Structure formats: C-alpha cells, structure tokens
Swiss-Prot record:
Cofactor note: Binds 1 Mg(2+) ion per subunit.
Family note: Belongs to the RuBisCO large chain family. Type I subfamily.
SUPFAM superfamilies, sorted: RuBisCo, C-terminal domain, RuBisCO, large subunit, small (N-terminal) domain
EC numbers, comma separated: 4.1.1.39
Chain positions found as N6-carboxylysine: 201
Organism expressing this protein natively: Ostreococcus tauri
PANTHER family: RIBULOSE BISPHOSPHATE CARBOXYLASE, RIBULOSE BISPHOSPHATE CARBOXYLASE LARGE CHAIN
One Pfam family recorded for the sequence: RuBisCO_large_N
Gene Ontology annotations of biological process type: photorespiration; reductive pentose-phosphate cycle
Gene Ontology MF annotations: magnesium ion binding; monooxygenase activity; ribulose-bisphosphate carboxylase activity
Gene this protein is translated from: rbcL
Keywords: Acetylation, Calvin cycle, Carbon dioxide fixation, Chloroplast, Lyase, Magnesium, Metal-binding, Monooxygenase, Oxidoreductase, Photorespiration, Photosynthesis, Plastid
Protein name as annotated: Ribulose bisphosphate carboxylase large chain
Length: 475
C-alpha cells in the first residue's frame, strides 16, 4: 500500500493509506465477557495475506475505513475498534480461513438486531480484497442479551396456553399455497384441525392477494378453528400471516387476529425485516398472541458454504428479535439440512446455555440468560414414514408440519391429519417405552397401521418417497 505522508508539521496526523493489520490485527488480545464475538469464513484474493483480510473485516465492520482520517484523533480507537484476534485455516480447503473478530459492546444499540447486523455484515461483504466471506457464528454476551425481550412467550408458556404436553405439536401448511378462495381455504383448515392437528398454517407468500384478501381469510379461518375446537375439545390454532407491505398494516392484521380470539399469528421475518419483526413481537407479547416465524428467503443468504450468513446466526438473531416458532429444516425432508449442524442451531434456539461444539458448527459457547426458548418447526417434504426420525431428532419441543403429507392423503385432509396424529403418538409412546426409533421406527409405524386405516393408507402412498441429495452446506 502507499506510504504515509505527513501533511502538516506538528499536527501528529499523517495522511495516507496503511495496512489494516497494523491497527486491527491483534493476536495478543484477550477477549472480554462483554465483547460480541464473530467467526468469519474468509477466502482472500490471491496474494492478499490472511492477516490483512481478517484485519480488514474487523476494521470495515467497526471503526475503520480505507485511508487514515484526522478525526481518528478525536476518539479512543483502542476502545471502540473491532479486533481480529485469531486466524485458523479451514481444514481441507485451499486459501480459506476462519477469522475471529471481537467487537466492543458500545458499538451497538441496545435491543436492536437491525443495528447489530448493519454493523457486522452491512458493508464488509463487498470488500474487494476478499473473494468470499461468510459469517459462521456470533457470540452474544449476556450483557447484550439482557437488552432484548426475545420470544413473546416461549415454549413452556405456549404449552400452558394450548394445554398440550408430552409430545411434539402437529401442523400443516394449507396447499395449494395460492389460488384458493377464503371459504375453501377455511374448509381445508377445518378438515385438518378436526382430524387431529394442533395447527394449520398460511404459506409464507399468502398475504392479501386478489383471490383471497386477508380479512376474508381471517374470518373463515376463525370459523374453522371454533368449529374444530367444539368438535374435538382441543385448543386449535392457525398461523395467520400478518406480514404486510408496511408496519401499520402488519399491526392492523395482528389486531384483527387478536379481536377474533386467535391464539397465534405468523410473520416472514427476513423479507419483512428485523425492525418490523421486533415491533410485531412486542405487540404479541403485550396482547397474548403467539408468534410463528417463517424464514422465507433464508437460503439466498445461508446456503452457500463460503459466502453469506449461516442460518445459526439468523436463528440467533430471531431469538433476540422475537418469535415463538422458527422453521429450522427437517434433516430428512426435501429442504437443505445436515443432521449435526441442524441439531446445533436447534439447541441454540431452545436451550438456555449451549457449549461450544465445532462438530455441530457451534464456534462459541452461548449463554442466553433469561431469554425464552424458540420452538423449532420441521417442515418441507415430510410424511408419516419420517415420523420416527423426526421424533428421535427433535424430541417433544418441536412443531412437525406436514403439508403435502396431510393434504395429499388419498382419503382427504381429515384422514391425513389423523394418520399423522396416530404416527406421532405411536412414535412418542415407543420412545417413552425405551425403544430405539432410529432402528425400530419402521416397525413402530407398521404396527400402528393395524389399528389405523388412515395411517395404513398414508404409508402405502408414500412408501417410496425419499429426498436423498448431498447437502450443499457442510462442516
């Protein structure tokens, strides 16, 4: 880089450009409990040292810029700058490194995921010295966690509201996702709920289109919920998507859902944005509504292993911003998800404390303090034959959503729902009796078919359906 040149004798300021690593690469730095820590996967351009790239990431995501500026002398850079404090090569990869960066807590606004992401990933990903950059993980210190309220209610409060214990929850996304009238949509909801599901769901792109305006959908769905509750004696819900083109309209839809007595609403948190999501989570907490979160657009951000943001970071951001449910992948269905990695961020969603575990992609131990847990939602290409694996992988504190796996039943929606409910309860009972679902799951399902014709029909339809493709994003 160009040498420094002094512009005025006696000022102590030297104009020019200097290497980032002279200021922002500090391998002797001892991280503080209050630091926000980030793990970046870097791919430097040929000829650019890893130390310079790591320092550039730290600089450009905190106090630095491309040239020396005289206003650096007006602040305490050592107090406010980000620091690249460690580098490690990625095993099995040429010219890839994990850069560990520590950020002082004072760089971030309290209770603002928007500001957190604007600072850490807002600009640095376009830096020319890097061929690719991916944010693999964040350590959120307890001091910063305590500035957020997180989930409106959390897992235990949700179970208390629904009076459902000892098993996973069952859901279904109504299909076709677009094109149904509000009345036919409500009918599909009713059939699924009376058949044994706990929830039905708007798809992520169901908002307020010409074929079905939001208010009409809300009214027919409310009718379906009250009718199915009266028939079954169970509390039912439907994830009414309150996502809208502006925050005022979003809150209006949430208010109507509340006035109709609905227990839960839904939000697309990535497409709508963190500010909108935190606003809605605050409303839901105050008004007693559960909040289901869909991750539409996540794969644009997280699927490529060398560039973007890993979903575990997006999941942590959601736990801060607020949501009672979050889609997490299934491991066994049609959507991307490696088992160890998925289990890693599922624990980060649910547990109060998670230890560092690189085998599961967890770069830092994470203490969530008192932030409520978020229930993972397994959805996408799953059916009754997947139930043993889902129960074994996710346990009880999860919502298992079978869209096509309910609505595609040859006898209709209600029998499809019944088949899933029987399969879930059979697998839960078998697990509680000490049986190994990974090894005996097929036998458990086949035995349950003998006293559930609905399940037997579902098993016959989907006996050959598998989604066996290599995972793109691996450790």
């Amino acid at each position: 880089m160009a040498p420094q040149t002094e512009t005025k004798t006696g000022t102590g300021f030297q104009a020019g450009v200097k290497d980032y690593r002279l200021t922002y690469y500090t391998p002797d730095y001892q991280v503080k409990e209050t630091d926000i820590l980030a793990a970046f996967r870097m791919t430097p351009q040929p000829g650019v040292p890893a130390e310079e790239c790591g320092a550039a990431v730290a600089a450009e995501s905190s106090t630095g810029t491309w040239t020396t500026v005289w206003t650096d002398g007006l602040t305490q850079l050592d107090r406010y700058k980000g620091r690249c404090y460690d580098l490690e090569p990625v095993p099995g990869e040429d010219n890839q490194f994990i850069a560990y960066v520590a950020y002082p807590l004072d760089l971030f606004e309290e209770g603002s995921v928007t500001n957190l992401f604007t600072s850490i990933v807002g600009n640095v990903f376009g830096f020319k010295a890097l061929r690719a950059l991916r944010l693999e993980d964040l350590r959120i210190p307890v001091a910063y966690c305590k500035t957020f309220q997180g989930a409106p209610h959390g897992i235990q409060t949700e179970r208390d509201k629904l009076n459902k214990y000892g098993r996973g929850l069952l859901g279904c996304t109504i299909k076709p996702k677009l094109g149904l009238s509000a009345k036919n949509y409500g009918r599909a909801v009713y059939e699924c709920l009376r058949g044994g599901l706990d929830f039905t769901k708007d798809d992520e792109n169901v908002n307020s289109q010409p074929f079905m305006r939001w208010r009409d959908r809300f009214l027919f769905v409310a009718e379906a919920i009250y009718k199915s509750q009266a028939e079954t004696g169970e509390i039912k819900g439907h994830y009414l998507n309150a996502t809208a083109g502006n925050v005022d309209q979003m809150l209006k839809r949430a208010q109507v859902a509340k006035e109709l007595g609905m227990p839960i609403i839904m939000h697309d948190y990535l497409t709508a944005g963190f500010t909108a999501n935190t606003t809605l989570a605050t409303y839901c907490r105050e008004e007693g509504l559960l909040l289901h979160i869909h991750r539409a657009m996540h794969a644009v951000i997280d699927r490529q292993r060398n560039h973007g943001i890993h979903f575990r970071v997006l999941a942590k951001a959601l736990r801060l911003s607020g949501g009672d449910h979050l889609h997490s992948g299934t491991v066994v269905g049609k959507l991307e998800g490696e088992r160890n990695v998925t289990l890693g961020f599922v624990d980060l969603m649910r547990d109060a404390y998670v230890e560092k575990d690189r085998d599961r992609g967890i770069y830092f131990s994470q203490d969530w303090a008192s932030l409520p847990g978020v229930m993972p939602v397994a959805s996408g290409g799953i059916h009754v034959w997947h139930m043993p694996a889902l129960v074994e992988i996710f346990g009880d504190d999860a919502c298992l959503q079978f869209g096509g796996g309910t609505l595609g039943h040859p006898w209709g929606n209600a029998p499809g729902a019944s088949a899933n409910r029987v399969a879930l309860e059979a697998c839960t009972q078998a697990r509680n009796e000490g049986r190994d679902l990974a090894r005996e799951g097929g036998d458990v399902i086949r035995a349950a078919c003998k006293w559930s014709p609905e399940l037997a029909a579902a098993c016959e339809v989907w006996k050959e359906i598998k989604f066996e493709f290599d995972t793109v994003d691996t450790l």
